[in-house]
Regions:
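A short, conserved structural fragment
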Residues: 65-74
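Short amphipathic alpha-helical interface segments
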Residues: 2-52
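Functionally constrained cores in energy, signaling, and assembly domains
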Residues: 23, 60, 69
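A generic structural signal for short, non-catalytic loop/turn and secondary-structure boundary residues
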Residues: 29-31, 64, 77
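A broad, low-specificity signal marking well-ordered, structured residues that form hydrophobic/aromatic
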Residues: 36, 70, 82
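Short, cationic-aromatic polyanion-contact patches
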Residues: 74-86
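Short amphipathic alpha-helical interaction segments
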Residues: 49-65
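Short, intrinsically disordered low-complexity segments
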Residues: 15-17, 61, 84
Length: 86
């Protein structure tokens, strides 16, 4: 994962991912160079309380580990936002 600290255009241009089913479907499609926003806030703490978020973030990290996508952390208005670029 890498951190980006420029404008918030990444956030505005992203597609919101709220379910594991949606996150999984992203990788069944041909790569489109789109940005998917999957969380804003304290990811580690929030994953402990939210099983769906835990599954989504583990999927994105696993896909990034094998080179299928990039996981990006970005500060927007003092909030930490997490994205996957695929």
């Amino acid at each position: 994962m890498y951190t980006v600290n420029n404008s918030d255009s990444v956030y505005k241009d992203s597609i919101r991912v709220r379910t594991y089913e949606h996150a999984n479907a992203i990788f069944s499609e041909k790569k489109k160079s789109k940005i998917y926003h999957y969380h804003t806030g304290a990811l580690a703490a929030d994953r402990e309380r939210n099983d769906e978020l835990d599954k989504i973030s583990h999927l994105f990290y696993r896909m990034a580990d094998i080179g299928k996508c990039e996981v990006v952390q970005k500060m927007i208005n003092k909030d930490c936002c997490y994205f996957c670029r695929y």
